[in-house]
Amino acid sequence: MRKLDSNLMHAALTALLEPKEQYQFPVYVGFSERYLSSLEQTYGFLAVTTHQRLLVSRFGLLTVPMKQQAFALQTLQKLSVRQIPLMKTRKITMQFQSTGKVESLRCFCSSKTFGMGLPNQEMQLQQLLETLNLWSTRSDLE
């Protein structure tokens, strides 16, 4: 069983890159869809790129790759970031619209990760959110 760590993050995000593209501000997140049990929760990574894209890499239980996606940042229609009370976790909801199709993404991101080799999670998260806010047509940051 592979561990979700900085090595897996780098490999997963690099696999989504276009030629001459680099990723920036990578963070570890938990993804949430409505009505899923805890066994169906997925985890993974988000990062923005030098080609103005959001990379999304999801892994299921036992680090099985689930879904790899990339969204053009100019298709970001809505961004909502909420601080969860009593926790250092943010709930991030994004909505992308491209060619008439709307896709929503909801994830949770903690400012600290332990045992994953991601010492700059808090700083990377702040920079990622600032970048997403620049591109969203409607944002609700808390």
Residue ranges of each PLM-predicted region?
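Canonical phosphoinositide-binding patch of PH/PH-like domains
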Residues: T99-M123
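Short, charged interaction patches at domain edges and termini
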Residues: E122, Q126-T131
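A short, structured loop/turn motif at beta-sheet edges
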Residues: E18-K20, L73, S98-G100
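Short, acidic/hydrophobic/Gly-rich beta-strand patch recurrent on exposed beta strands
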Residues: I92-S98
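Anionic N-terminal interaction surfaces
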Residues: M1-H51
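Phosphoinositide-binding peripheral membrane targeting modules
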Residues: Y35-F45, T50-I92
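Mixed-charge, glycine-accented linear interaction segment located at domain edges/termini
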Residues: E130-E142
